[in-house]
Amino acid sequence: MNDFPWLTIIVVFPISAGSLMLFLPHRGNKVNKWYTICICILELLLTTYAFCYNFKMDDPLIQLSEDYKWINFLDFYWRMGIDGLSIGTILLTGFITTLAALAAFPVTRDSRLFHFLMLAMYSGQIGLFSSRDLLLFFIMWELELIPVYLLLSMWGGKKRLYSATKFILYTAGSSIFLLIGVLGISLYGSNEPTLNLELLANQSYPVTLEILFYIGFLIAFAVKSPIIPLHTWLPDTHGEAHYSTCMLLAGILLKMGAYGLVRINMELLPHAHSMFSPWLMVVGTIQIIYAASTSPGQRNLKKRIAYSSVSHMGFIIIGISSITDPGLNGAILQIISHGFIGAALFFLAGASYDRIRLVYLDEMGGMAISIPKIFTMFTILSMASLALPGMSGFVAELIVFFGIITSQKYFLISKILIIFVMAIGMILTPIYLLSMSRQMFYGYKLINVKNFSFFDSGPRELFLSISILLPIIGIGIYPDFVLSLASDKVESILSNYFYG
């Protein structure tokens, strides 16, 4: 056990420092904004310091572990710990939340509450990625919902209440399955119930029971990921949310579902995962094609980007269901890569909206002349989204391809078919992304409007765009930095499977 409670401090600090903000005298919005940014930067520095000096790359076991008795009556522990699977997502959370706090500068209405909810989300997300106890995992999973619901319903667009209600119905409904799974797994087959993930990883279950648990967890994670057909809350939510909230949703929230699939479905229930993986592979392949085909039909800019997120999540599902070393590594790399790319695209969509106050693509056009910096950044990040070589998305998708090719589980004909359908999806991706860019930035529509003038991106927006672009290019050029974090953990997860 670790001597110093690093993870507890990292989890508790944002929400406790954020709650202080609610009691401070109101000194204007600027104070709240800078206070939040300072907390986020401090938290990110603290996390980086703790991991740099205490995390050993070549150790697949749990590190920085903490184990405190919390509720005696229920035998409930506060168990924290990280491994190669969670370290990348925790650092991604810190980075994206800090930039989202900077992106939220234009928010003036109830800014204290807005920034507090952001920090509460921050704590919930890091708590989820570092929890080593199933009930604690569930509590952190639920802690996330309330801030997102309030951020949607109070600072969204015209249909914000509809999209917030849809979000809470989908996610809270799926949480029932998660709770049943958590209680079922912990109470099964022993006199003393245990919620400890390390002990549960060595537990074996009857096949029927394992399949039931797997389906319960799969439904919960499929809503968050999202996996079709449980994805319909996502375009509505992204279409109405403020763009700083969209950055958190696309950058981190969707990754929680994928993380849960690996952490619980793959690690705790290997036999059921082995049985379900061909179906997941089919769903992931359909998802890539479906989202890439549906996206061009969206008039709303943010909804179109949301469908691109659904398409990218298809690659993660395929990587997870390939049950191979490259496949799972590629899925983890795609989780990190899409976290940056999705957040960046939503930020630039929001920056454009701040200027022209239009959300529908058929009303836009001709913006490239007036805002060349935003146009340049949007074009580069669209290229990153369509997996241009040299960007992080390309490496992730390529490794997932290798994962399918090297998989021992599937017949050659089925592998060829899956790769063929994925290739069609990759051809459709540039079509909707480049047509989106063309509708926004080329043509004459806005130039012909009277009083047509607005300023290009300021230093804040330029700094934000470049900050997200650098890791995308960095991972694209040197992916081994991210891959080396999780490689030992991936091997230990796959050691439970008989092929791979």
UniProtKB/Swiss-Prot annotation:
The lineage of its organism: Eukaryota, Viridiplantae, Streptophyta, Embryophyta, Tracheophyta. It is an enzyme of class 7 (translocase). Belongs to the complex I subunit 4 family. HAMAP family: NDH1_NuoM. It catalyses: a plastoquinone + NADH + (n+1) H(+)(in) = a plastoquinol + NAD(+) + n H(+)(out); a plastoquinone + NADPH + (n+1) H(+)(in) = a plastoquinol + NADP(+) + n H(+)(out). It is found in: Plastid, Chloroplast thylakoid membrane. This is NAD(P)H-quinone oxidoreductase chain 4, chloroplastic. GO terms for molecular function: NADH dehydrogenase (ubiquinone) activity; ubiquinone binding. It comes from the Eukaryota. Pfam families: Proton_antipo_M (PF00361). NCBIfam families: NDH_I_M. The keyword Plastid applies. Its EC number is 7.1.1.-. Its main location: plastid. One of its GO terms (biological process) is ATP synthesis coupled electron transport. PANTHER family: NAD(P)H-QUINONE OXIDOREDUCTASE CHAIN 4, CHLOROPLASTIC, NADH-UBIQUINONE OXIDOREDUCTASE CHAIN 4. Signal peptide: none annotated. GO terms for cellular component: chloroplast thylakoid membrane. It comes from Barbarea verna (Land cress). The chain crosses the membrane at residues 4-24, 35-55, 87-107, 113-130, 134-154, 167-187, 211-231, 242-262, 272-292, 305-325, 331-351, 386-406, 416-436, 462-482. Keywords: Chloroplast, Membrane, NAD, NADP, Plastid, Plastoquinone, Quinone, Thylakoid, Translocase, Transmembrane, Transmembrane helix. It is a multi-pass membrane protein.
